[in-house]
Amino acid sequence: MPIEQCDKGFYKCYRTQLLPSKPKLTVPPVSFDKLSEKQKLVVRLVDNHLKGVGNQKNEQLQVLALGCAGAGKSAALLWVKKLLEEKQQQDENFAFKAVSLTGMAAFNVNGETIHSAFHINPYAKTQKQRMDSVIQAARNPDICKYFEKVKFLLIDEISTCGLAMLSFINKFLQLTHPGNDDKPFGGISFCFFGDPYQIRGIADYSAWEPLCMFLREKYGGIQDHYFGIPNCLFLDVSFRQSNETNSSSWYFGFLNRMRNLELTVDDIDKIRARMSCNLSAEELEQFEDCLHIFPLKLLVQQRNR
C-alpha cells in the first residue's frame, strides 16, 4: 500500500522528519546595511573570493576575525555562512564545514563539533592517539571522496583551539587534499572567529604563545601558519549594546572591563549581589530551568533525575 494511503498523521510525520528536505539557508540576525564597516569587510572578503573577484577564485583565502563580547562576531559569521550555503546550493562540487570545539557553540552556528567533523577520537588519552585517529580517518576512501568537495572551513570560538587541536585539523585537511599537503589546512580557504581573551585550549598550548623552536617542532609549524594569516581584522565596534536593555549593556561592558583587567568597585559589588547566598527564594526559583554546568558527570546525572 502506498505510504500516502496510510494514517495521515503518520504520513505527515514521515514527510517532515524522515524524508530528506532542502536545507534552509541561514538567516542572519541583522541586515547587511546594519553591520559595522569591519563586519562588512569580513563578509565582502568571502563574497569576492567565492565569486572569483580579482582572480582570487583559486587562491586560498585566509581570514582571522577577532573581537570582544558584543562586537558582532556572530552576526558576521552568520552572514559568511549564508554566502557559503548559497554557493553550496549553486555548485555541486563545493562544500564547506562550519565547526566549533564545544557542542553549544557548534549548535549556535548550526554546525558540527571539531571532533566530529575531523574524526578526532575524544576518548584518546594522549595527543599521539588523537593524531593517529585523525590519520586513520583521513585515509578512509569514502571520507577522502567527500572532503574533495570541501573548499572552505569556518571555525567559531577559535580561542578554544590550541596548537594541538589546530595541528589535528591541519593534518586531516592536508591528507584529504592531496597535492596541497605543504599548504596550511590543505590549501582550502578558511575564516576563523573568536576572542583571544577568552578561554584557551584545555590541556593545550595557546595559539598565541610566543614562537619558539619547541612548539614549531612539536606541532609541525602550525603556529607559523596561524601568525601568518594575512587578513586579520579586529571587530572593535560595540554591536549589541545599541539595542539591548540597560542590564545587558552593563553586562557586556562588564565582560570587556574584566578582559582588560579594568573592573571597578561597582562591578564587583553588582556581581556579589547576584551570588546565590544573597538572592531571595523567589529569585532563586527563576534560575530553576536555566542552564546548569557541573564539573562531574555524576552531578549532571543527579540534576537530570
Where are the language model's segments positioned?
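Conserved ATP-binding/catalytic motifs of P-loop helicase motor domains
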Residues: 1-305
